Amino acid sequence: MDAALLLSLLEANCSLALAEELLLDGWGVPPDPEGPYTYCNTTLDQIGTCWPQSAPGALVERPCPEYFNGIKYNTTRNAYRECLENGTWASRVNYSHCEPILDDKQRKYDLHYRIALIVNYLGHCVSVVALVAAFLLFLVLRSIRCLRNVIHWNLITTFILRNIAWFLLQLIDHEVHEGNEVWCRCITTIFNYFVVTNFFWMFVEGCYLHTAIVMTYSTEHLRKWLFLFIGWCIPCPIIIAWAVGKLYYENEQCWFGKEAGDLVDYIYQGPVMLVLLINFVFLFNIVRILMTKLRASTTSETIQYRKAVKATLVLLPLLGITYMLFFVNPGEDDLSQIVFIYFNSFLQSFQGFFVSVFYCFFNGEVRAALRKRWHRWQDHHALRVPVARAMSIPTSPTRISFHSIKQTAAV
């Protein structure tokens, strides 16, 4: 059935139902002929609530919907909508007073989701602080700007931008989300662009390491502009194609949130999954070469495996391999769902922190450059103190009087 025809039928049913309701309540009185000639027509909103014909300037209340998205709501509460002076309905409907009726299982999940949200906020805050500090260190320490550290710097930049966009998404309330505002869709688009650039810079990290370690190709021949193009430019057409698809096929709910049967999000999720799979292959080859080199050394087997495991754990957040754990939801089991929620929230929100620690704060070049700057500052400060003392007027702890000088001269 055509969507426009279906909507008109629903609005017709809405008008009939409201007419019956008003007549039963004794409200079936025609409008005042001396009153205003413009009225807000009977309409059906996106939630499915019927709004009756109303006079301009009126604040109309209707019972909350009984069910929405499979959740039962308290119908004794009311939703509110204003009929504007020009005879049109306000675009925003106030559903803030509508409360869901949750059973014990839903209440438990609601509690876990609230705790997971706190973990997300904490992780993103800690990550942003660490990432900004790492960004400033790479900005100030010009002596360590080799290609490898430039790649780290760009990856850290994408983490910062992605986390900031995540905070902006949290500011969007339910009404704006349902209203599908233009600025809301723009924020979702920007967030998804930074998500894709973040993964593509993880791919760049994998390309660099695989080229240097597995292919034993001289990194001096690698071009910075090529990595910049891969990390920042390739995600642009991907996100543009996704935005066009959303605009024409799934233009609702600020383009955020995926429902069953929605395929447009795979336009950008597909390339992300592909680069993660490639990075997994890179990681396998890097660890394989590392194990081969460790076996050729004279160290004990236990130390060799320890070094290999350490290198693998350090590379996991850099290459984004941890995201592969969240490709598939564990299922309907309660314990699995709860573990999935917390594990997902912790790893995804704290990943920026781990990358900053492993590849900036624990970076030998960064620490050596910081020590060098610190010693230089100490030397410079130590030189300034004697000069300042030499320029000051010396004073004696004892005062010599003019009378004593005369006595000394007389002797």
Curated annotation (Swiss-Prot):
Keywords: Cell membrane, Disulfide bond, G-protein coupled receptor, Glycoprotein, Membrane, Receptor, Signal, Transducer, Transmembrane, Transmembrane helix. Residues 1-108, 172-185, 250-265, 328-334 are extracellular. Glycans are attached at N13, N41, N74, N86, N94. GO terms for molecular function: corticotrophin-releasing factor receptor activity; hormone activity. GO terms for biological process: cell surface receptor signaling pathway; G protein-coupled receptor signaling pathway; negative regulation of angiogenesis; positive regulation of adenylate cyclase-activating G protein-coupled receptor signaling pathway. The chain crosses the membrane at residues 109-139, 147-171, 186-214, 222-249, 266-291, 303-327, 335-364. Residues 140-146, 215-221, 292-302, 365-411 are cytoplasmic. Disulfide bonds join C14-C50, C40-C83, C64-C98, C184-C254. Coiled coil: none annotated. It comes from the Eukaryota. Monomer. Interacts with CRF, UCN, UCN2 and UCN3. This is Corticotropin-releasing factor receptor 2. It comes from Mus musculus. The lineage of its organism: Eukaryota, Metazoa, Chordata, Craniata, Vertebrata. The gene is Crhr2.
